[in-house]
């Protein structure tokens, strides 16, 4: 089966990762020790995508847990599903990265990276046909951002033809954990643009908004946020984990979603939104799911797609859903909102179906969109970056670890380029292109 190796780095990555494994273990009928006691053949059919089968009907996640300090790892190990993971797959340092990207990427992280790669290699060798890697991390810190991107580039070197998907928590406009977040995030995006095949952008602020506005939680905890993220991750990976009519793998997803190699940053959404522990007793219908899924309030990244246009998007429906109904709804959305879709990619909504719904829901849908409005997110981080970098504030923390100012300048301009590329395709129409060609045709002068 087409296996995926999962890595989680840093505090954020490990917490999201732990929530993800808890969610999919439940969906596949595994208890907290990885013992199968499910009811459906379908749960077992593609179990091997994420789990290794060990002796005694026990399944072990193909996961590598990485951090530069032992704290979060201990918490995961002590958590409800801590016994699920293979003990050798916990790789951690003692020093911490102190929210410093340079420590994660160049000094502390670089010392630990070979140990991690050994574990990754061992996991990859245990696969029949590895399709790729997925990594959960945040872009604002030191370990997830710095060491996470280091791992991505190292894995890229060693497995150049395998897919690399990242679930990246991007800094949010209002909620900031550290002052140097814009630095860390910009340096990370600089890496992701080059080395990742698909990046699912998740944003704490958007998650807070969903918790407060939609789920009416007065003070959401990180547990509530991680629950939302794990719902989306479970949805995005559904097609990989269960047999379905329209199945996809990481590569098919990328082929359908990425029209230009650098523009692989996706917004994600999920419907119906329910809070942790609350079951939705209301029956949901396909039209409702579709409407909710395309609602900007449901997006888990703080950028509003109405300020841009969709290059491509993909919807994954789960549960007992009629294919015909889904296709009608999708066509409906596209016709009604045609101004939000670029007209030079016809039929740019792709749908997939899976018969197995998430736990406690009759049906659900997950949305993945490649929208030019994601540039708002990069713009915002870029502006904060420039404000600090112009004064060279906090730079000594990075140069002290051996970084060069030049690298900051490069990262800044790469991010600005990314923003203008999104803008360029947002403005592009069909007719403009043709006019340009007509103008260029009659030029016969020899080139100097």
Curated annotation (Swiss-Prot):
User: SMART domains per the record?
Assistant: Tubulin, Tubulin_C
Q: State the UniProt keywords alphabetically.
A: Cytoplasm, Cytoskeleton, GTP-binding, Magnesium, Metal-binding, Microtubule, Nucleotide-binding
Binding residue positions for GTP: 11, 69, 138, 142-144, 204, 226
Xref: Pfam families? Tubulin, Tubulin_C
Q: Where in the sequence does UniProt note compositional bias of the Acidic residues kind?
A: 429-448
Q: What's a GO cellular component annotated to this UniProt protein?
A: cytoplasm
- Which InterPro entries does the record cross-reference, listed alphabetically? Beta-tubulin_BS, Beta_tubulin, Tub_FtsZ_C, Tubulin, Tubulin/FtsZ-like_C, Tubulin/FtsZ_2-layer-sand-dom, Tubulin/FtsZ_GTPase_sf, Tubulin_C
GO MF annotation list: GTP binding; GTPase activity; metal ion binding; structural constituent of cytoskeleton
Look up the signal peptide feature and give its range. none
Its BP terms in the Gene Ontology are:
microtubule-based process
CDD domains, from UniProt?
beta_tubulin (cd02187)
Question: Sorted alphabetically, which SUPFAM superfamilies does this protein's record hold?
Answer: Tubulin C-terminal domain-like, Tubulin nucleotide-binding domain-like
Question: Where do the annotations place Mg(2+) binding?
Answer: 69
Stored Gene3D superfamilies: Helix hairpin bin, Tubulin/FtsZ, C-terminal domain, Tubulin/FtsZ, GTPase domain
| UniProt cofactor(s) | Mg(2+)
Described purpose of this protein according to its UniProt entry: Tubulin is the major constituent of microtubules, a cylinder consisting of laterally associated linear protofilaments composed of alpha- and beta-tubulin heterodimers. Microtubules grow by the addition of GTP-tubulin dimers to the microtubule end, where a stabilizing cap forms. Below the cap, tubulin dimers are in GDP-bound state, owing to GTPase activity of alpha-tubulin.
Q: Which family does it belong to?
A: Belongs to the tubulin family.
Protein name, UniProt field: Tubulin beta chain
């Amino acid at each position: 089966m087409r296996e995926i190796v999962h890595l989680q780095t840093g505090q954020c990555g490990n917490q999201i990762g732990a929530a993800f494994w808890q969610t999919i273990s439940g969906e596949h009928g595994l208890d907290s020790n990885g013992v199968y006691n499910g009811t459906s053949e379908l749960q077992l059919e593609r179990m091997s995508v994420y789990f290794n089968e060990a002796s005694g009907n026990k399944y072990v996640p193909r996961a590598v847990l990485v951090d530069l300090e032992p704290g979060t790892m201990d918490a995961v190990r002590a958590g409800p599903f801590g016994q699920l993971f293979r003990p050798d797959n916990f790789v951690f340092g003692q020093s911490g990265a102190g929210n410093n990207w340079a420590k994660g990427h160049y000094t502390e992280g670089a010392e630990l990276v070979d140990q991690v790669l050994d574990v990754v290699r061992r996991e990859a060798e245990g696969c029949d046909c590895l399709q790729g890697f997925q990594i959960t991390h945040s872009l604002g810190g030191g370990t997830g951002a710095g060491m996470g991107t280091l791992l991505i580039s190292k894995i890229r070197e060693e497995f150049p033809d395998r897919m690399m998907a990242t679930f990246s928590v991007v800094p949010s406009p209002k909620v900031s954990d550290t002052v140097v977040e814009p630095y860390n995030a910009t340096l990370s995006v600089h890496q992701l643009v080059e080395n990742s095949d698909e990046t699912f952008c998740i944003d704490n602020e958007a998650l807070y908004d969903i918790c407060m506005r939609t789920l009416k939680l007065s003070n959401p905890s990180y547990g509530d946020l991680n629950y939302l993220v794990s719902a989306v991750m479970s949805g995005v990976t559904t097609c990989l984990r269960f047999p379905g009519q329209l199945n996809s793998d990481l590569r098919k997803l990328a082929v359908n979603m990425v029209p230009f190699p650098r523009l692989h940053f996706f917004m994600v959404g999920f419907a119906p939104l329910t809070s942790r522990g609350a079951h939705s007793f209301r029956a949901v219908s396909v039209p409702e799911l579709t409407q909710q899924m395309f609602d900007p309030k449901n997006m888990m990244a703080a950028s509003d797609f109405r300020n841009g246009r969709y290059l491509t998007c993909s919807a994954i429906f789960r549960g007992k859903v009629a294919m015909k109904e889904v296709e009608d709804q999708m066509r409906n959305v596209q016709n009604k909102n045609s101004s939000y879709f670029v007209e030079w990619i016809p039929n740019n909504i792709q749908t997939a179906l899976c018969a197995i719904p998430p736990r406690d829901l009759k049906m659900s849908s997950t949305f993945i969109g490649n929208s030019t409005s994601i540039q708002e997110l990069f713009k915002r981080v870029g502006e904060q970056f420039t404000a600090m970098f112009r004064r060279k504030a906090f730079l000594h923390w990075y140069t002290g670890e051996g970084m060069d100012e030049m690298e900051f300048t490069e990262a800044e301009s790469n991010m600005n380029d990314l923003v203008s590329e999104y803008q360029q395709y947002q403005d592009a129409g069909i007719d403009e292109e043709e006019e340009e060609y007509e103008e260029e045709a009659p030029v016969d002068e020899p080139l100097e």
